Each structure stands twice: as structure tokens, then as C-alpha cells.
Amino acid sequence: MSLLAIGINHNTASVELREKVAFGPEKLSLALNQLSTSSHVKGGVILSTCNRTEIYCDVRSASKNKVIEWLSQFHQVSLDELKPSLYVHEEQAAIRHLMRVACGLDSLVLGEPQILGQVKQAYAEARENHAVNPATEKLFQKAFSVAKRVRTETEIGGSAVSVAYAACTLAKHIFESLADATVLLVGAGETIELVAKHLAGHHCKRMIVANRTRERALSLAQQFGADVIALNEIPDYLAQADIVISSTASPLPIIGKGMVESALKARRHQPMLLVDIAVPRDIEPQVGKLNDAYLYSVDDLQSIVDSNIEQRKVEAIQAEAIVSEESATFMSWMRSLQAVDSIRDYRKQANEAREELLNKSLQALAAGGDPEKLLIELSNKLTNKLIHTPTRALQTAAEQGEPAKLAVIRQSLGLDDLN
């Protein structure tokens, strides 16, 4: 078992690079199949969100560069472009990183709970595609239990802070009151649902949900009293929106500069706030150059969320201590597995020797042998059989002048306790 975690996130890579290496739903099954059937990988999970793309896998020795090369080739991104933003964690560092991610300690918004759901979804998709092996299974199950422990023992998730919350906070900063604002939500996934929940608390005048799948949009709209439109109807409704918040899995922008320009003319250039929290981006970056259009991307939210992080930093110290403890414990368990086969083989060898000598003694006893003599003979032969290999190892280490090896063997045999 050799654990590896590689990836990029909002701290190391720009939105542009994160867009290039994002695994959309249409690519994920193929990627998991390629990864798990590679001769270098025993099992793996791919986590791809707006803020990070990460690969967690159980690899064969000296295979980390092969996984990095695969990521580069799969997305047709050169290693020269990828490597400066790439982080690589191995063994306990990989374990610790996944636990930190699952606990929200590595998120754009410290302690945000949504990432745990995303990690669980990534794990479920890997299982569905038969990409998970026993090592990654154990790793992710442990990460989930650690995240639960952190939520139980700390208050890191005590306040509603998330990218979705930050988007709503931005809207509140720009529009003093949302009571007169019409909000267009593009997408109907988990992030948009969180945005809708936050907005509902501010009683905005009207909420419109635009989504590719009408059924999902209707489900969301019914919760919050919103109207529903199709994505291709956005140009007809955009002028009515004071605030646009978008988060879809579309590989191409949904809202372009020309569309917004037309909407602003129809609005007589009343200001419009557009918040794009999708990766790849849903709104063309050129929209930000238009007068009266205020465009913010995921990266722009960083400055907003900073003010919400302070209250969680103290709790994060305790959470980090839990992660350090749990990652060390898991690493110790992993190391103990390396001895399992050896212990099993050693026990088998000792039992076979015992059974062989015992059977011979029982046969001799049945033939009328002296029980006392046979018992002494059995104990002597069993002792000699069991100490033969360790004795040879001690002799060889001494003859070859290897005091360190000799000391290890003595310690293993418990001889140091006799002095």
C-alpha cells in the first residue's frame, strides 16, 4: 500500500488552469477507468470541484510521476504549465491532506461543510466505476469519520460560511436591501440550492431559476417560490435581473458579453451584479469590461470571505490537532499491515513444526514408548526447531560484522530484556 495525493486548488492555480484540468461529468467515468486500469495504480478517486482537482490513489512504488503524466495527457495540458501549480503528497501527508479537505480545513471558506458532500460524491462515483480498492476504501471511510469527529468536537462549522454564502454577502454589500431585487440563478445544483437558501432569508422580490433540466429546477423553485425558465430563455429574462448568480457544469460559457450588453440597454443601464461560481466559467470574462456590469469570479470571492474566516480560526487549531492525530494513527495501521503476511507465515511455520513433532511423539507413545522420555525429547526437538533460523541469523550478522542488524535481531527475540 502506497498512498498518493496530487492536485491543484484555489491556492495554487488560477481559474484558467483549474478550468483546463477540471473533470466534468462527461469525462469522469473515462478518467476513472483509465486511472484504475493503469499498471501503476491499484485504485483511485478523483475529486473535481470549482476550487480543486485532486487525485487520490494507491500506487505501486515509484509511480507518482506516471500519475502526473497521465493527468497532463488526459487534459492536454503541458507539464511545464501544470507542475508549478501542482502539489504532491505521499503516505501520511496524503492521508492528512484528504482529512483536511474533508473537514473543510483546505477550503476557500474555512470549515465549509459542502466539501464533505463533494468528497463523498467523488468516492461514490469511483465505487460505481470500480476504481476503488481496499486501500482507498479504508482511506476515504476514515476521512469521513474524522470529518464527523471534527464537526462534533469543534465549532468550525458553527456559522454559515461558504462560497454560496459569500456570493450572497457580496449581493448584500452592493444592494443595501434585496427586498427590491430580482435574482436570476443559473443552475440547480447543490451550490445554487445553498445560494437560494441564503437569499430566501433576505426576502428578495423575485427569484428565477434557469436550468438545463426543468424537473430539477422545478424542485428547487417549489422550495423557494421561484419561477423556472430554460437556459435558452435567459436572453429574454436577463434584463429583469438585478443579480445573476451562476453555477453549472457547462463546458462552455452560458452568458456572453453580447447577451449582457443587450440586457443592460433594456435596463437603461441600471447596475447588474453577476457572480460566476462555476469552473469552467459560465459567464464570459469580457462581461466585466462593460459599464454597469459588475462581474465576480470564484477567485474574487476570496477577499469577501476573509472577513468571515476569523471566527473559525481558533476552532481550526483544534481541528488540525485531530487531523494530525488521526492521520498518524491511520499511518501506523497501514504500516502494521506490512507485517501481517510475515506474521501469518511465521505462525504457520511454527505450527507445522509443532504438529510434525507432536504426531511423531504420539505415534511413539502409542507404540509403548516411555512418556517422560518422549516428552523431554519433544520439548528439546521443538526448541531446536524453533530457534534454528534465529540462531543462524545471529551468527551471520556477527560473522559479517553487522552490529546494527545483530542488535535488531536481539531486540526482536527479546534478548535485551535479559540484561
UniProtKB/Swiss-Prot annotation:
Transmembrane segments: none annotated. Substrate binds at T49, C50, N51, R52, S107, E112, P113, Q114, Q118. InterPro entries: 4pyrrol_synth_GluRdtase, 4pyrrol_synth_GluRdtase_dimer, 4pyrrol_synth_GluRdtase_N, GluRdtase_CS, GluRdtase_dimer_dom_sf, GluRdtase_N_sf, NAD(P)-bd_dom_sf, Shikm_DH/Glu-tRNA_Rdtase. Its EC number is 1.2.1.70. Gene3D superfamilies: Glutamyl-tRNA reductase, N-terminal domain, NAD(P)-binding Rossmann-like Domain. One of its GO terms (biological process) is protoporphyrinogen IX biosynthetic process from glutamate. The active site is at C50. Keywords: NADP, Oxidoreductase, Porphyrin biosynthesis. It catalyses: (S)-4-amino-5-oxopentanoate + tRNA(Glu) + NADP(+) = L-glutamyl-tRNA(Glu) + NADPH + H(+). PROSITE patterns: GLUTR. The keyword Zinc-finger does not apply. Pathway: Porphyrin-containing compound metabolism; protoporphyrin-IX biosynthesis; 5-aminolevulinate from L-glutamyl-tRNA(Glu): step 1/2. The keyword Magnesium does not apply. One of its GO terms (molecular function) is NADP binding. NADP(+) binds at G187, A188, G189, E190, T191, I192. It comes from the Bacteria. The record marks H97 as: Important for activity. Catalyzes the NADPH-dependent reduction of glutamyl-tRNA(Glu) to glutamate 1-semialdehyde (GSA). Belongs to the glutamyl-tRNA reductase family. Homodimer. This is Glutamyl-tRNA reductase. It comes from Vibrio cholerae serotype O1 (strain ATCC 39315 / El Tor Inaba N16961).
